[in-house]
């Protein structure tokens, strides 16, 4: 039998039309390599970036590298029992953590599991750890203050609700102490707090939790922990988990504060993961997307408008704005703020509080350098009375540091210069503050008023601290009504100024210094 070309062509067309394409998505793969917490999987055709992959023994990994013939994933926890040939499955979901009021007062790990021995957590649902930050239209400008309780910060570097304010400095100079005191100061303010500890010793974290409990702030705080001994993947993801827990309050029209302690260690953990995944290294061996690592996290801190809250809660909450304020911490090496990660985070945040080793060693606690510390948006949120009284404080300190350096070379100083130096010395001494002793708005106002109006001129430098303590004790006992008014309203007018002046005049007359 012979077929001509036309018949052959028709037959081929007919077969093509009848052919059915049968495709089967594969969601099961095989581990082909295990090393240093990284697994390489073959056979996963249906997997997305950041997806949770189910491993044997009820464990999970996260897919980070999607390559032509394999998937690189990082294991969330111990990996010693995993071996080549083990079967794994895709789950179709990304990592989620529990959120809600039930987490307040608890210590949890990166996955939101309790590690404080207080039993299971009653949560209000789950939230993905990776969430797109609110857009420009959904945001509201920062105009409400977050009081840290530190005179040096609240007067010169004010922080607003929804702001990102970096705390930067060398190791062991009070970065965590400043952040913890800020959390302690929120116990009666209604601001919910989240403290994220990344890459720290378990004993250090236990001490922080104990201090928060002692000062009555733990009931208002969620502590998220990824210790130095835990997998790099958990250290890398801990800030995102804590952020999702803080966003729960923001999206329901409440105010929240989150401390990331610290993002340097998170960047190191991410660098470790990236190098093990054989991603190309860049400056200081960090991967190319280390800026995005921090920017997508810190952009989630914001103040959102009432429409956003109403839309998110489906009309349950109306007319209320919400905020998430971030205090990221960065550790520098020998004061080098021009290193890769510090410059990245400085450019992302709305200002920085720079702590200096020399100031710390000279006895100034908190060791804030007012010259290079700045708050780019907090000024609009500053309490009126603090804003009015602190105007000359920053100038006095800046002039003092400049003149102090100059006076070392000058043998003879005129009276005006000497007066400026003496005033600067007294203001510097007044800015000293003990740890775990945050001050109220009224207490800060009285101290700043005394400095601004010249009440410290006749006080010996060594007695400034005692003078301040006695003055505040006098004001809170003899003029409690005035102090309550200042705390409640935060306003400053001629009446309040007159009362403060009369009170301080009376104190100076009755006391000998």
Swiss-Prot record:
- EC number annotated for this UniProt entry: 7.1.2.2
As its record notes, the protein acts as a catalyst of: ATP + H2O + 4 H(+)(in) = ADP + phosphate + 5 H(+)(out)
**Localization per record:** Cell inner membrane
Record's keyword terms, sorted: ATP synthesis, ATP-binding, Cell inner membrane, Cell membrane, CF(1), Hydrogen ion transport, Ion transport, Membrane, Nucleotide-binding, Translocase, Transport
CDD domains, per database record: ATP-synt_F1_alpha_C, ATP-synt_F1_alpha_N, F1-ATPase_alpha_CD
Which superkingdom heads the taxonomic lineage of this protein's source?
Answer: Bacteria
Q: How does it assemble?
A: F-type ATPases have 2 components, CF(1) - the catalytic core - and CF(0) - the membrane proton channel. CF(1) has five subunits: alpha(3), beta(3), gamma(1), delta(1), epsilon(1). CF(0) has three main subunits: a(1), b(2) and c(9-12). The alpha and beta chains form an alternating ring which encloses part of the gamma chain. CF(1) is attached to CF(0) by a central stalk formed by the gamma and epsilon chains, while a peripheral stalk is formed by the delta and b chains.
Annotated protein name in UniProt: ATP synthase subunit alpha
Species name for this entry?
A: Shewanella sediminis (strain HAW-EB3)
The organism's taxonomy opens as: Bacteria, Pseudomonadati, Pseudomonadota, Gammaproteobacteria, Alteromonadales
Q: Which gene encodes it?
A: atpA
């Amino acid at each position: 039998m012979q077929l001509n070309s036309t018949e052959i062509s028709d037959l081929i067309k007919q077969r093509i039309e009848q052919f059915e394409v049968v495709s089967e998505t594969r969601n099961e793969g095989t581990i082909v390599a295990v090393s240093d917490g990284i697994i390489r999987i073959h056979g996963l055709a249906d997997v997305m970036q950041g997806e949770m992959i189910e491993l044997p023994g009820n464990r999970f990994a996260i897919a980070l590298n999607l390559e032509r013939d394999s998937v690189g994933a990082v294991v969330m926890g111990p990996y010693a029992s995993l071996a080549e040939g083990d079967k794994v499955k895709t789950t179709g979901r990304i990592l989620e953590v529990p959120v809600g009021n039930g987490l307040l007062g608890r210590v949890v790990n990166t996955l939101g599991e309790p590690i404080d021995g207080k039993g299971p957590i009653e949560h209000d649902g789950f939230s993905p750890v990776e969430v797109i930050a609110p857009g420009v239209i959904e945001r509201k400008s920062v105009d409400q203050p977050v009081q840290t309780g530190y005179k040096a910060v609240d007067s010169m570097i004010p922080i607003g609700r929804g702001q990102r304010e970096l705390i930067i400095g060398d190791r062991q100079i009070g970065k965590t102490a400043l952040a913890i005191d800020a959390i302690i100061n929120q116990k009666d303010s209604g601001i919910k707090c989240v403290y994220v500890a990344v890459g720290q010793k378990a004993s250090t974290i236990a001490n922080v939790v104990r201090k928060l409990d002692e000062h009555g702030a733990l009931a208002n705080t969620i502590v998220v922990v990824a210790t130095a001994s835990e997998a790099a993947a958990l250290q890398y993801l801990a800030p995102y988990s804590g952020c999702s827990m803080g966003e729960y309050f923001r999206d329901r029209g409440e105010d929240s504060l989150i401390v990331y302690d610290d993002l340097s260690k998170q960047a190191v953990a991410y660098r470790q993961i990236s190098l093990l995944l054989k991603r190309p290294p860049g400056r200081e061996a960090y991967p190319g997307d280390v800026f995005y690592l921090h920017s997508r996290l810190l952009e989630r801190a914001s103040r959102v408008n009432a429409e956003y809250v109403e839309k998110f809660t489906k009309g349950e909450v109306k007319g209320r704005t919400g905020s998430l304020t971030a205090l990221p911490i960065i550790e520098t090496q020998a004061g080098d703020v021009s290193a890769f990660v510090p410059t990245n985070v400085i450019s992302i945040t709305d200002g920085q509080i720079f702590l200096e080793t020399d100031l710390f060693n000279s006895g100034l606690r908190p060791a804030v350098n007012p010259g290079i510390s700045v708050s780019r948006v907090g000024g609009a949120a500053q309490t009126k009375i603090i804003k009015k009284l602190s105007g000359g404080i920053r100038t006095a300190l800046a002039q003092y540091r400049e003149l102090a350096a100059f006076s070392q070379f000058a043998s003879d100083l005129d009276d005006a210069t000497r007066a400026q130096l003496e005033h600067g010395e007294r203001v510097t001494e007044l800015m000293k503050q003990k740890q775990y002793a945050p001050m109220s708005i009224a207490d800060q106002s009285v101290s700043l008023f005394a400095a601004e109006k010249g009440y410290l001129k006749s006080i010996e430098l060594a007695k400034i601290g005692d003078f301040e303590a006695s003055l505040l004790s006098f004001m809170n006992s003899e003029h409690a009504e005035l102090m309550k008014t200042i705390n409640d309203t935060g306003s400053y007018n001629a009446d309040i100024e007159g009362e403060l002046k009369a009170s301080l005049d009376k104190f100076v007359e009755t006391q000998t210094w």
